[in-house]
UniProtKB/Swiss-Prot annotation:
ATP binds at G8, R11, R92, R138, R141. Its cofactor is Mg(2+); Ni(2+). This is Multifunctional CCA protein. GO terms for biological process: RNA repair; tRNA 3'-terminal CCA addition. Monomer. Can also form homodimers and oligomers. Belongs to the tRNA nucleotidyltransferase/poly(A) polymerase family. Bacterial CCA-adding enzyme type 1 subfamily.
């Protein structure tokens, strides 16, 4: 039995990136031998085992062959003690992921992965790359993950990705979302969507986002003009401001309604917030996006523009906004929405380093409103809904007083 460290652990070690998890491939052994050695089998589709002590994954070397269209269900696998390391590595997606390291630290690199690491290329290992359409998303995700190191996709791999678009609808929603979620967690999530657009996959997988490219916005507010470009800039800014997947996904969706604006109304997009809600719902339902992420995206789509004008809003409107986004039961949601609105404001050409004043105002308004406690209302011998109504009135009055003293009086 020979064991080799493979995949991302080897790649990241060579790039001097912290290794998060380690995967191993085992050569010259059988399923029965692994079980006798105390390994626990966990793979259903092919033999994957957990080490009895480290609990790291060990997989028998295998080869695979496409037997039908689609994702994993379209493959047949063969794992045996006779399969070589080179055969196992050949089935992998990119050369930089097809490097192995033996127990002595020696590298086995039959497909020139080290060369591509040094030259910062994302390159497919073999023609078998095109057999799994998920690899289009994986390459886009690696492009986002390694963009800060200046990795690029080689033209040959880009061309192959373009030829795989027709099979993307066969992917399960779970696989699409899993790759998208990983991409949203990278330093440069906007690169993922840009790569998908460049190869034609965005129109198939995210038509609501693809429709934003070429849609103009007023140059006065959006020097970058193109709504699709602005959306990518907003996602990039959101990634700078927050690690939250929910925040980053909501920033992707925030202007989705502008794709519905009739051409004769361009570049204005009145009512694009509420108009975008059904699109967000449809997108999230199609990809089976978790409810918590979906709910934030819907709220942001509807209300993000309102925050930009927060200082001009009447106290009644501010309170209505706070209740609409349920801030007293979900206080974390307000900060998420402020961050996304800031990303929206700074995700514009020339505004990247601007201070977002409405954020400070909204936080202070919420603090003032939250200083009014339910116990201050209950003492008025009110019952039922009247308690909530009175609490709302008190909070509105507190904001009105604070706003008049700190903002309106200074403007006079």
């Amino acid at each position: 039995m020979k064991k080799y460290l493979v995949g991302g652990a080897v790649r990241d070690r060579l790039l001097q990136i912290p290794v998060k998890e380690r995967d191993w491939v085992v050569i010259g052994t059988t399923l029965q031998d692994m079980l006798k050695a105390g390994y626990q089998q966990v793979g259903k589709d092919f033999p994957v085992f957990l080490h009895p002590k480290s609990h790291e994954e060990y997989a028998l070397a295998r080869i695979e062959k496409k037997s039908a269209t689609g994702g994993y269900t379209g493959f047949t696998y063969k794992a045996s003690s006779e399969i070589t390391l080179e055969e196992d590595l050949k089935r992998r997606d990119l050369t930089i992921n097809a490097i192995a390291c033996d127990e002595n630290g020696s590298l086995i690199d039959p497909y020139n992965g080290q060369r591509d690491l040094n030259q910062r290329w994302l390159r497919h290992v073999s023609e078998a790359f095109c057999e799994d359409p998920l690899r289009v998303l994986r390459v886009a995700r690696f492009a986002a993950q390694l963009a800060y190191l200046n990795f690029r996709i080689v033209p040959e791999t880009r061309l192959m990705m373009q030829h795989m678009i027709s099979e993307l609808p066969l992917l399960s929603p779970e696989r699409i979302w899993k790759e998208t979620e990983k991409a949203l967690a990278t330093r440069d999530p906007q690169i993922y969507f840009q790569v998908l657009r460049d190869c034609g996959a965005l129109k198939t997988l995210f038509p609501e986002i693809d429709a934003l490219f070429g849609v103009p916005a007023p140059a006065k507010w959006h020097p970058e003009i193109d709504t699709g470009i602005h959306t990518m800039m907003t996602v990039a800014m959101a990634a700078r401001l927050s690690d939250s997947i929910a925040v980053r996904f909501a920033s992707l969706c925030h202007d989705i309604g502008k794709g519905l604006t009739p051409r004769d109304h361009w570049p204005s997009h009145h009512g694009h917030g509420p108009a975008g809600i059904p699109l967000v719902q449809s997108l999230c339902q199609r990809l089976r996006v978790p409810n918590s992420i979906r709910n934030l995206a819907i709220i942001v789509t509807e209300y993000h523009d309102l925050l930009h004008y927060a200082v001009k809003l009447k106290p009644k409107t501010l309170i209505k906004l706070f209740y609409a986004i349920d801030v007293w039961r979900r206080p974390e949601r307000l900060e998420q929405i402020i961050i996304i609105s800031e990303a929206d404001a700074r995700g514009r050409a020339g505004y990247e380093n601007h201070f977002y004043k409405p954020g400070q105002f909204i936080r202070e308004a919420y603090r003032i409103a939250s200083s009014i406690m339910p116990c201050q209302v209950i003492s008025h011998n009110l019952t039922g809904n009247k308690i909530g109504e009175k609490l709302r009135q008190y909070r509105q009055q507190a904001i009105a007083t604070w706003k008049q003293q700190n903002y309106e009086s200074k403007q006079q």
